[in-house]
Amino acid sequence: MPKRPHPPPTRRKKTPKAPETADEYLAVAVELEESGERWRSGDVAKAGRFFVQAITAYESTLVRYPNNFDARYNRARLLYTLTQLPLPPTFFPTTSTPEARLLAAAEAHRECNDLEQNSSDILFNYGQTLSSLGEFYANKPEEGEDLLEGGGVAGGEETLAKEIERLLSSKQAFENSWGVLQQCLVVQEADYKSTLEQSQSFGGIRDGGDDMNEKDDDDDDDDDENGGVKLPSVEERRNSTASSQSSNSGGGSGGNNATQWASILEPTTKLSILDTALTMLEVQTSILTLSTPATATKIFSKEYLEQITIHANTILENYILPIAAGLHEAEDDDEYSRLGLETNEISEKEMEATLSRTNFLTALAETKYYLGLSTLETWEDEVKSAFDPYTLYPPPPPPTTSPSPQPPEEYKGIIDLTTSWMALCDRSTAYTTLSTAILPTNPSKSWKLLSTISSPSLSSATKLAPKKEKPGIYLARGNLELLRSKIPIEAAIKGKEVLLKNAGVYYRGVVASAGSSLIGAVDGVKIKEFVEEARVKEAVIKLEHEGDWEPLKAVARSGVNREAVWRVVKGAVEDGVFGRETLGVIEAGMRG
């Protein structure tokens, strides 16, 4: 019998050296964070585990070196990152709630801001965290509304009081966010002015130099033309995990070969100012979208609307529109050309600026109506005007040789919102909301708006949107067909069977489009929710119109839990696509 070879000797893993200096502690945490970033698009849960370990490592650094600002800043940023990842509730300890995690992230950013008050990065992140807190309160389910927690078809003054309390909490968080972002804008403007002054001063020195200086210029062709090294983008800087100089770390380097951490501060540009201004206007729009027919007068007033309109106009006229217009002229403006934006990036920013204005105006028009400050006709006119083609800046003057101005259709500065799938979706939403308000008094007009504007807008958006956005659009199209089937006019009654069939086709389209392309982990979680909602609604159509429970039971057997079913149905009833009696039938059936 041949002798078996000896197995290779086992190599024992070397025990990693315990960190001793502030830089070594920080290096451990940064390595864990970078590992999380590598898994972020492929395995969200694995990324989350690395981020939790990184937070623990940053906290260990702070225990040893409490003055280490970099560990404090990175910890705050990661606490917020965890709130934005689509992690299942089981990922966190049972004592950890979404609200508690957002509050912890906000508090961590407040501490950073208290220590370093003139950092636009900290202020921007702090404002984003507070805005997310506002969104959480805006969408927070009321306690006890789930079926299994003893909820049911809630109503009455107590429910309204709780809703108002929730909306006021959301409004307060959004207002706090806006205030912090306003501070960020002030800091950015000061930084920008300082950068310009330094650039002009340095440019004067270079202009007065001799031939040797010119030779130096030739050697530095790869550097920024203002004399500095090429710096990372604003987004890279906001997400950077690099720490500042070790003298700020609260400890020594521990040797010449130790890792040295240094921050590269990018000069503030007009693009970073534009990003902050757009975020501010988005926050104000979010405040207005809190209004409902039942709550608007409880959380808003005429004076408040006037104030928020003044603030929004200031942001639009002084920052968003002129800066976006300048991007269009990048080729002729040395300052803008240094931003290095491609043509498609400029077009996207122009569209984003225009759409931010449009969405604010439509939200304002809706809230004004709920407060009794306008009529349905005025609301409709304001929505139509908001989505009209818009010019970021006036057309150029006509040539002296031509007596007539340049035709508007030939002027490339006109922004046509019908070329953007996002704008088309927003247009459909705005007209659907208007149609719902018109329905009780003028069902024919409601039908016309849905059939001639909302539905065609979504149809066009389907053709323009990237693949990963199609499931959400198909879901909206299914909801719209259900809504049309509920309108009490002859056309809807005669076409009800076709409308319900169309809704089913679109709901199945959600499922089909969700599996038709490679979708990242983060988008995949959102799309999974779309698929669940579509399957539940298609099953409820069968139950509501045929009395068939089997499709809904099949959905439940496939892994969609009862809480999810209840949440989808309850939301659909509130949106008017299912009758309240259907909610009662499903409640009784699920309890049985």
Regions inferred by a protein language model and the residue ranges of each:
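Eukaryotic N-terminal targeting leaders
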Residues: M1-G48, A57, P89-P98, D219, ...
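Long C-terminal extensions of eukaryotic subunits of large macromolecular complexes
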Residues: M1-P7, E377, D381-S385, P395-G592
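Amphipathic alpha-helical repeat scaffolds of TPR domains
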Residues: P19-W39, Y65-P89, Q117-P141, E189-D211, ...
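Long, compositionally biased, phosphorylation-prone intrinsically disordered terminal regions
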Residues: Y25, L32, E143-E145, A154, ...
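Short coil/linker segments at helix-helix boundaries
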Residues: S35-Q53, T81-E111, S132-L265, I287-H311, ...
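N-terminal interaction modules that seed assembly of large macromolecular complexes
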Residues: R49-A57, D70, N74
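Structural marker of alpha-solenoid helical repeat scaffolds
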Residues: R64, L115, V187, L464-P466, ...
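Alpha-solenoid helical-repeat scaffolds
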Residues: T269, I287-G413
